[in-house]
Amino acid sequence: MRVLYLLNVSNSSQLSADSGYTFADLLAPALTDAGAEVTVASPVPVGDPRVHFAPTTSPVTKYRARFDPGVDALVTLMRERQPEVVVANQIEAAPAIRAALLEAGVDALIAGYCHYLPFSFTDTGVLELDPAMDDRGLGRSVLLAFAAGLAACDRVLVHSSTAASWTTAAAARTGVDLGNKLHIVPAPRDVRLVRSPDDILPPQGRATGIYNHRLYKHYGTARFTQLARRLVANAPVRLTVMDLFGARSSERIRLDPSPERHLEELATTDGVTIASDRGDRIRYGNLLADAHFGIAPFRPGCPWSMSVIDCQAMGLPVIGPRTGWLAEHIDNELLFDTDEQAVRITERLATDAEFYLLHAKRAFASTADLTPAAVAARYLEAVR
């Protein structure tokens, strides 16, 4: 099976902060091991030399990625690679991919991977547009472009049951019937970030929590900052907050200056340490190993989080707000609705060794089915 994997890399200068690239870097070799001939079309190649590379140029903004997929380049790519399966990691590009295949005279299945949902649903079923995709009121247009992409796909792959439910509901509201297209294929865990819970020691009355998520406003960073202050003031914990971006370009700061503002605020908070992996996954793993638990983001309607999986694969219990995929995936004893509940949970993790080790084992076990080989098998089954 010839697979053309179209990948938009939004953080080419900080690949370790780009979950889509990390996903491809893990999945493409596993697909190759399973017998597929994989070409990754991307600005940068993945690490395995067995995976073919077709260099592309990523759109300079998130809106160009959704509204300007570059049909001319797609037609050339289809003619050169003659794929049997095209993976569209930017769902909104699927209609352009369909048109390019038609023009190139290539008959290939289009599998859309919903790596990012530009919407979420409240507990009462209200559809909310992602504020990060709603500058100058563009959110509705992004939603419709997403729906058009779903309609153009032969297969639609999502991370979780939560994402499947939301995607189905959003499609129905825009007149798209997914039928039997939809498949749940979670992302793989990083083989470099796996630690047996048997090697973990519980904290001795004081714990270190780690927050390893991007500091965008739409990730709920202001809400996390509020919680961070409560935790370091009222629980026996200190926090490590990761700066995943480092120095960003002036263009990216102009589009969204929120990470720099939040980083500055967190850096002046007592009990909070800012750390960077400097793009090194080994250093990142060491930072995780030095922590005792992780904190999930307050991102509204979170459909999946690579950073949560990173923590759990290292045997770190992750606490999180009771919302979206987090409520589906994280153990109920570690979910909270209020800051007071979060304080009590972290106090227990810091002081109750039996409770801590139980949840370290549960965290690790929750990633057991996410090996690259297992995910590749599910992926290939979905696109056959």
Please provide the spans of the model-predicted regions.
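Active-site proximal beta-strand in glycosyltransferases
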Residues: 85-87, 101-138, 157
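A charged, aromatic-enriched C-terminal amphipathic alpha-helix characteristic of glycosyltransferases
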Residues: 353-383
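Conserved donor-binding/catalytic core segment of Leloir-type glycosyltransferases
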Residues: 157, 200-219, 225-232, 240
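A short, active-site helix/loop in glycosyltransferases that binds the activated sugar's phosphate group
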Residues: 139-180, 189-191
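Nucleotide-activated donor-binding/catalytic signature segment of Leloir-type glycosyltransferases, i.e.
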Residues: 253-282
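Short hydrophobic beta-strand element within catalytic cores of glycosyltransferases
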Residues: 293, 313-320
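Acidic donor-binding loop of glycosyltransferase active sites
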Residues: 286-303
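N-terminal subdomain of nucleotide-sugar transferases
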Residues: 1-47, 81, 229-234
